[in-house]
Structures are given as C-alpha cells and as structure tokens.
C-alpha cells in the first residue's frame, strides 16, 4: 500500500520494476477510470484491456477471453471482472482506488498467484478515496441501516490501509 500521489505513474513504476510483461489486474472504481487506465497503460507500451459492465457484451467477452488465454495481458477493470476468472498465472492485483470493504479486497487480491508462485497485491491509497466513498454512501438512496454497514466496512478498510505493521504474507 503506497500513499497516493500520482496513482497512474506509481502503478507504471510498480509494473516496470516488478511485473514487466506479466499478467495482472488493475481495479478501478469507475468505468471511466477503467477506460482511461487501459489507454494510459497501452500508451506506455503495456498490453492492457478494459473490462466493465457498461461495455458491449461481445467486446467485454473478447477482452476476458484474451486475458484468460494470452500471456502478459493486464486487465483494467471494475469489480464486474472477477467472477469465474481462474487464470493461474496472475502475478499482481493492483487497486487504483480504495476497495469498498476488506472482504472485497481479499476476494480481488485472491485472484493473484493461484499457481502457487509469488504474486503481489498493490494499492495506491489516499485520504481523498475515503472522502469520495463516504460521499457515495451518504448520497446513496439506501436505508440508514445499510449505510451504517457500508460505513463500518469502509472504516475497516481504512484501518487496514493506515496500519503501521507489516502486511506482507
């Protein structure tokens, strides 16, 4: 977990230093950010594809198939990507935005290293992520009980990000 300054540049440095040419998943909170991130990575010479629920189904399926079958593809995705994905050689899972819960983070990062080889979980985290998610919770049309549950989950995620002890496994 790194302090977010310029998340895309930080991601690029991480990929070039540790995962050049390897398969991975970059999770983003919005569809727009998925598209922008995939385009950015492609412009930097990294084979990246977007995946989100707003894409035409044939394009989404083609991108998923390419990711599953080919080596070295990076998938920029929302949480819509993941169910049924069992690519054993995913070397990293990165988050450009704070996940909504520890449970979600655990599930998403668990998609890396299924072949038993070393893999990394990486996240760029900043206080603005918390502010944005709190606003999304506050402005949602959910009932107050559900909003409280979401707030507790966000607080737990914040606790993980702010802990000073080692998170390396």
Where are these regions (language model features)?
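Helicase motor core with emphasis on the C-terminal RecA-like subdomain
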Residues: 1-152
